[in-house]
Swiss-Prot record:
This is Myocyte-specific enhancer factor 2C. Transcription activator which binds specifically to the MEF2 element present in the regulatory regions of many muscle-specific genes. Controls cardiac morphogenesis and myogenesis, and is also involved in vascular development. Enhances transcriptional activation mediated by SOX18. Plays an essential role in hippocampal-dependent learning and memory by suppressing the number of excitatory synapses and thus regulating basal and evoked synaptic transmission. Crucial for normal neuronal development, distribution, and electrical activity in the neocortex. Residues 1-61 form the MADS-box domain. Keywords: Acetylation, Activator, Apoptosis, Cytoplasm, Developmental protein, Differentiation, DNA-binding, Neurogenesis, Nucleus, Phosphoprotein, Transcription, Transcription regulation.
Length: 441
C-alpha cells in the first residue's frame, strides 16, 4: 500500500504536523547516514522545530564538522528552498505536488511503481513460459520393437499416425505387404520361436500396421512392429486357437506342419525335405487361394483337453497363408522318419496300391503305427469292421454325417508318434527321391 501524493504546504493540524516531522526527520537522518557510508563523506544536520527545539546529526563529530565549515573560505554550493523548487520545476515536477518518495521509508513503493513492477513481472513470466513451450520438442512416440523372423528379405514398415509424430516420416509401401507372394525359386522355412536369424531392430512410430490373415495391413495392432514380407501373418494374429470343428464344413481338412524349434537340431533331413516339398507345392500349385487354417505343431503332447482327438498337439495361435498343406501334401510326407520318433503319413491313391499288395501282417503293423500313443488308451482300439486302411484314409475324406464326430475323436493319421524300424531309417537323398516319385504319380 503506497502513499498518495501530498501537497508540499504547511500542515495546519498540530498533531499531524508533529507526526510528519518525526517520521521525516528520521528519514532525513537515514539518508544522511547512507550517503556518508556510500560516498565516504562527512555530514552534519542541525534542525530546529517550530518550538525551537534542536535536533542534530553528525556522521562523525559535530564540532569537527562545524569547525571545518567555519574555516572553509572557498566558493561552494549552497542551496535554499527556492533553489530546490526551481530545480524540481526544471525536471518536470511540481514542487507542491511532488510525491516526495524519500519522506517516509517505512512505507513501500508508490502505487505507480508497484503497478509498473507487477506488469514487468507478468511480462517476464509470460516470456519464460513461451520459451519453455518452444524449447520442448514434439514427441514422436517411437518404440523400438524387434521380432525374430526367418525371412531373408526383411523390411521395416512404419506408419506414423500420431498427430505429434514427425511429419517427415512417410509410410513405407512394399508389394509384399499388400499380398504375400512366394516366387517358385525361393525356399522359405516356417518361422519358429527360437529362430533369431532374421532379427532386426528399428525405431518405428506408433500405429505401425502389421498384416492380417489376408495379407493386408492392420493399423490397430501393437505399435512399432518389425515385419517381413514372407512372414507378415505368421506371428501376429488371434490370441487363442478356434474350435476345431469350425473350419471343417464339407471340405477336406487342410493342415500345415510347423516344425518346433527343439527338433531342428535332431531332424535336419526333415527340414530339407519340407523345403523341397514346399518348392514342389509352389511350382505345381493351380489355386492361388490362401486358406487360413490352423497351424498344427508337431510337438510333444501337452494337455489332454486340446488338440485333435486323442493327440493333443500344441496348436499354434497364428494363421499363416503361404505354408498351407492339404491332405494330399501330407500324404507325400509319409516317409518322414526321424530320430525323435516323428512320423508323418497318410494313405492316398498311390499308397493304397502298395497296401493292397502288402501282407496282412504289414497292414496291421502300419495300423498300429498310426494310432495314438499309449498315454491315451481310450483311443488305441479300432472300431469293429474298420481296417487300418480305412482308419488312415479317414483324414482325407469329407466330414459328413456321424463320421465328423468320429474323425474328430480319432484324427491320428496325419501326425502320429511312432518309432521307426531300422529298415525305414533312410538317408535324406533316398527320402527326397521317393518324395519326387510320389509327387509325380
Amino acid at each position: 500500500m503506497g502513499r498518495k501524493k501530498i501537497q508540499i504546504t504547511r500542515i495546519m493540524d498540530e498533531r499531524n504536523r508533529q507526526v510528519t516531522f518525526t517520521k521525516r526527520k528520521f528519514g532525513l537522518m537515514k539518508k544522511a547516514y547512507e550517503l556518508s557510508v556510500l560516498c565516504d563523506c562527512e555530514i552534519a544536520l542541525i534542525i530546529f522545530n517550530s518550538t525551537n527545539k534542536l535536533f542534530q546529526y553528525a556522521s562523525t563529530d559535530m564540532d569537527k564538522v562545524l569547525l571545518k565549515y567555519t574555516e572553509y573560505n572557498e566558493p561552494h554550493e549552497s542551496r535554499t528552498n527556492s533553489d530546490i523548487v526551481e530545480t524540481l520545476r526544471k525536471k518536470g515536477l511540481n514542487g507542491c505536488d511532488s510525491p516526495d518518495p524519500d519522506a517516509d521509508d517505512s512505507v513501500g513503493h508508490s502505487p505507480e511503481s508497484e503497478d509498473k513492477y507487477r506488469k514487468i513481472n507478468e511480462d517476464i513470466d509470460l516470456m519464460i513460459s513461451r520459451q519453455r513451450l518452444c524449447a520442448v520438442p514434439p514427441p514422436n512416440f517411437e518404440m523400438p520393437v524387434s521380432i525374430p523372423v526367418s525371412s531373408h528379405n526383411s523390411l521395416v514398415y512404419s506408419n506414423p499416425v500420431s498427430s505429434l509424430g514427425n511429419p517427415n516420416l512417410l509410410p513405407l509401401a512394399h508389394p509384399s505387404l499388400q499380398r504375400n507372394s512366394m516366387s517358385p525359386g525361393v525356399t522359405h522355412r516356417p518361422p519358429s520361436a527360437g529362430n533369431t536369424g532374421g532379427l532386426m531392430g528399428g525405431d518405428l512410430t506408433s500405429g505401425a500396421g502389421t498384416s492380417a490373415g489376408n495379407g493386408y495391413g492392420n493399423p490397430r495392432n501393437s505399435p512399432g512392429l518389425l515385419v517381413s514380407p514372407g512372414n507378415l501373418n505368421k506371428n501376429m494374429q488371434a490370441k487363442s486357437p478356434p474350435p476345431m470343428n469350425l473350419g471343417m464344413n464339407n471340405r477336406k481338412p487342410d493342415l500345415r506342419v510347423l516344425i518346433p524349434p527343439g527338433s531342428k537340431n535332431t531332424m535336419p533331413s526333415v527340414s530339407e525335405d519340407v523345403d523341397l516339398l514346399l518348392n514342389q507345392r509352389i511350382n505345381n500349385s493351380q489355386s492361388a487361394q490362401s486358406l487360413a487354417t490352423p497351424v498344427v505343431s508337431v510337438a510333444t503332447p501337452t494337455l489332454p483337453g486340446q488338440g485333435m482327438g486323442g493327440y493333443p498337439s500344441a496348436i499354434s495361435t497364428t494363421y499363416g497363408t503361404e505354408y498351407s498343406l492339404s491332405s494330399a501334401d501330407l500324404s507325400s510326407l509319409s516317409g518322414f522318419n526321424t530320430a525323435s520318433a516323428l512320423h508323418l503319413g497318410s494313405v492316398t491313391g498311390w499308397q493304397q496300391q502298395h497296401l493292397h499288395s502288402m501282407p496282412p501282417s504289414a497292414l496291421s503293423q502300419l495300423g498300429d503305427r498310426t494310432t495314438t500313443p499309449s498315454r491315451y488308451p481310450q483311443h488305441t482300439r479300432h472300431e469293429a469292421g474298420r481296417s487300418p486302411v480305412d482308419s488312415l484314409s479317414s483324414c482325407s475324406s469329407s466330414y459328413d454325417g456321424s463320421d465328423r464326430e468320429d474323425h474328430r475323436n480319432e484324427f491320428h493319421s496325419p501326425i502320429g508318434l511312432t518309432r521307426p524300424s531300422p529298415d525305414e531309417r533312410e538317408s535324406p537323398s533316398v527320402k527326397r527321391m521317393r518324395l519326387s516319385e510320389g509327387w509325380a504319380t
